[in-house]
């Protein structure tokens, strides 16, 4: 058995982006949000994910812009560190080690070099207590610095970041907990407390849920469980304080936010309606309804042009100041629980699972982006606590991705159970699934499982239910409507036992159906019962056929913590082992099978082939939660790994979902390094960011450079020093600081032109030499006519005695011979 080597469990996306309030950059071009152990940066114009700020080892719990630099952002995490980032380029600037788990982060313009954190302190009675502390950030050239200078500002505060807010730029801080509002003044170093009764005259719930401070006035807005909003004034006096009450929300107010100039107050709650209250006249308000899930956070940009709302369905809405939604950033929708399995759409290769109520969501794992929702229930969802509504509980694709089967139900009690079986056909025109058939009474009791045939030649759906029957559904032609619909083709049962699981073999020739402790094998062509396999004690929990060379094996797990492997050729038990398997998942492209085991409050992973009981790979303590959902995702390009422990990841990648709704995957260090070098690398050549444009043009320039090297001598190659610098500046300067394209065009073209100054000078010199030689030849011809013999003798004597001269010396001599010395005659004539 190969033990754990360099394979690690990593978050592959889908983390909560609504965990903390999103923040908008000062120029309203970027929105930053917490996402698991990283911070995601999105564009407000395109809603596209730009990059991640990765470096924390635990959940990020707060983010805030650096008041001294608008292009920097602080982030705090439960790992006990605060990091300072350049969020434009995604570069980590500095890490401050605090040493305590951090739950929220606040900054103030009037407190330079100081940040405020909510930390957890354990008291003598082992009760967790939260404190607000001020941390003085030391100035150091080192990248990692310890910041141990903490001073307590307030004790026994709420860990909810919405219950703490700074007022008047940092003159005071307001924080609420239960029924008490506290205001701490930094200059006076004094705290004033104000309390409310548990219930008022109308039996309302007065507990505080959030607070917000006006940016310029002495006013504090508080939200409460009963949906009321209170505006507190004169809170610098214990007895003379006043408050006014406004009420619109029918349930708890989740978040409050003043606009930067303080002219409006924004509020949000479970109603999915953003309410804008006019500060001067609270009776005037505007509404932006139907935003999706309940609003959990509200934030505004520094210029007041954009608002952001974070929703319970893991979505961020970008809203203009005119109260118009301009963009949506949708993460992996995280409901209370996932009823369907994790599936891969054969066409789009997207991850498919439960989305918002009554929908299936299609999510791109490669881009970490929500693609679209498919409305299964096709009914308006009412956001009201305790209301029983339809939910999608089962879904499955056929082999080609042409058909989708879903089961929706409502009613927690058997007598009130109502469910529908729906079959959806893929429409090539709309590139989506269209409802084809609805079966209102597919079974008399709840459907427990369903699966499509794995054969591409026939399309067949099998369902099992607690009514003791399994049914096979096939397509039937409708002559009147000129289309196919689905109908029941066969009904099977076994000794009045209740079936729970079903699956087809790799070639679709055998159907396996489990009836409590008995395995039954059926022929889909004749519906003949081929054989039964007597399972060891315990009801069958899961079934899985082997693939490729292991297709003759059938795996099953039981409630008695047994994993069994059956040989279908001999109809005998090949091997079995005692292990509590919570999820059994086969790889469609190999013989490998992954088994998640839950023991001692931890989940462990075993990867094996059914033909070999000894695991190929094992990793203990994968996560703390139980894993019930997993899927193998085929890779677009096979990953060639020579390491024996990583070979099971070559063709497919294993994803799994925890009870905490964290989507995780297994990745090798080699694969992460390869991805980092290709797409996440931040510096190269003089610490310049790598962009796709640079990689494309840079490759072309390297090829051209190689070609020039092969065809020309090094001394003959022109130097493009200035042009190269210009091109580098154009390619590597951040887009937000570049001038307009019209200005860059002429500069870029000029930089590509070869400088001809040296060539022109050389050409001029050559022309002068040619003219000089021509004139010299003419002069020599004239001299030959008058004294040819003397010239011949002089020339002969020179040829015999002169040393070899360089070309430069010869040119100089020729120029001297050309010089006009006629001016000397005047001197000779004037001599007495």
Swiss-Prot record:
GO BP terms in the entry: positive regulation of rRNA processing; positive regulation of transcription by RNA polymerase I; ribosomal small subunit biogenesis; rRNA processing
Location in the cell: Nucleus, Nucleolus
UniProt keywords, alphabetically: Nucleus, Repeat, Ribosome biogenesis, rRNA processing, Transcription, Transcription regulation, WD repeat
UniProt KW Iron keyword: no
Protein name per its UniProtKB record: WD repeat-containing protein 75
Species the sequence originates in: Danio rerio (Zebrafish)
Lineage: Eukaryota, Metazoa, Chordata, Craniata, Vertebrata
Compositional bias segments (type: Acidic residues): 764-785
Function, as annotated: Ribosome biogenesis factor. Part of the small subunit (SSU) processome, first precursor of the small eukaryotic ribosomal subunit. During the assembly of the SSU processome in the nucleolus, many ribosome biogenesis factors, an RNA chaperone and ribosomal proteins associate with the nascent pre-rRNA and work in concert to generate RNA folding, modifications, rearrangements and cleavage as well as targeted degradation of pre-ribosomal RNA by the RNA exosome. Involved in nucleolar processing of pre-18S ribosomal RNA. Required for optimal pre-ribosomal RNA transcription by RNA polymerase I.
One Gene Ontology cellular component: small-subunit processome
Example of a GO MF term: RNA binding
SUPFAM superfamilies reported for this sequence: Quinoprotein alcohol dehydrogenase-like, WD40 repeat-like
InterPro entries listed in its UniProt record: Quinoprotein_ADH-like_sf (IPR011047), WD40/YVTN_repeat-like_dom_sf (IPR015943), WD40_repeat_dom_sf (IPR036322), WD40_rpt (IPR001680), WDR75 (IPR053826)
Tree of life domain: Eukaryota
Bilayer-spanning residue ranges: none
WD repeats mapped onto the chain: 4-43, 47-86, 90-134, 148-187, 196-233, 239-278, 281-320, 326-364, 378-425, 432-474, 485-523, 527-567, 572-609
